[in-house]
Structures are given as structure tokens and as C-alpha cells.
Amino acid sequence: EICNEISADRILDAIQARPACRTAAVVFSGDTGFYSGAKKLNRLIEERAARDYETEFIPGISSLQYFCAKLKLPWEDVKVVSLHGRKGNIAGAVRNHRKVFFLTGGDSAVSGICRTLTENGLAEAVVYVGERLSYPDERIRTGTAASMAEEEFDPLAVLLVENEKVMRRDTVTHGLRDE
């Protein structure tokens, strides 16, 4: 039997409503350790039903991994910012890091992020947008923050921003230099 629930509470309720079911699989997209609903569901199972269930995580590929592979870019030096259901310092992240990956969602849509960058002096930052990644109608677009600010994008999108003009920070120390 297939249940289409997305809330951790409702997923656990659906499992518990079927006591004859000995094995259940809960499928989340992406990597279970990368901003996944698996974390909340596992915590809920531990709180409410630890004696009744044994959990196992089998991760998929995260949107970060997938998108960077499509772009042929390594991601070990990428700053990750989740704006999915939360706020973040968009301009600050881009000013301080050469590459920033944004998980979008809710009020933080791609065009809004690009507008924020443009309004904060980062109009020329290069923006890669991945829409509906891994679906047949997947689309990847590239432009500057300014050129993407008024475009329309699918709500199921991520973006990676490259900023060649990262703020240079000199280390400040107290006292005299060692010479």
C-alpha cells in the first residue's frame, strides 16, 4: 500500500495505523543527510516509537551533488545555504565565498535571490540555475544576477553563484608583528 504523506507526524501515523505491516519504506528525494525530512522523521520515531521500529538510511544523490556534476564543477569548496523555509544572509554569503549553493523554497525564489544580489552590488556575479533537476524537463540556465533577477523560474529550483570578487580579509592581530 502506498501513502503519499510529507509531514513526519503523518508518515509515522500512517505506519502506526498498519500494525500488520512488518516492513515499511519511506522514500525522500536526495541525500538523507542533506536538509532531508529523514532527520525529523527519525527523531520522531526515536521519541514516540523507538521500541517498535528499526530505521535504516539509504541516501540518494543530493541536489548539490547532482547540480555540480551537471555543471562539471567540484563542490568541496562550495558554501551551502538553505533558504528552504528559512531566511539567510544571501549577499553576505556571496560576498564572503567564491561559490555559494542555495537551496530555494517558500519566499526565497531564484529571481528574488538574484534581485537581492543585484541590490547589494553583486549584479555581475555568475548565477547557474537548475530547475526540475533529474526530471525529463530539467533545465539549466546561466547568466548574471542582474540578468536573472526578472526571469521566471520553476519553484523546484536550486542555484549556484560564483563570485570572482570575494571580499579579501586580512588577519587582524593584537600587538607588533613578529620579525
Where are these regions (language model features)?
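Short, acidic/turn-prone active-site loops that include or flank metal/cofactor-
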Residues: 1-11, 61-63, 79-87, 105-107, ...
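Class I S-adenosyl-L-methionine
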Residues: 1-55, 179
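Short amphipathic alpha-helix with an adjacent loop that forms part of the alpha/beta core around
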Residues: 10-19, 90-94, 147-151
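Short, glycine/charged-enriched secondary-structure capping and boundary segments
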Residues: 15-16, 39-43, 70-73, 115-117, ...
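A contiguous loop/helix-start segment that scaffolds small-molecule binding in enzyme catalytic cores
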Residues: 23-24, 96-179
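Class I SAM-dependent methyltransferase SAM-binding "motif I" and its flanking Rossmann-like core
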Residues: 33-98, 150
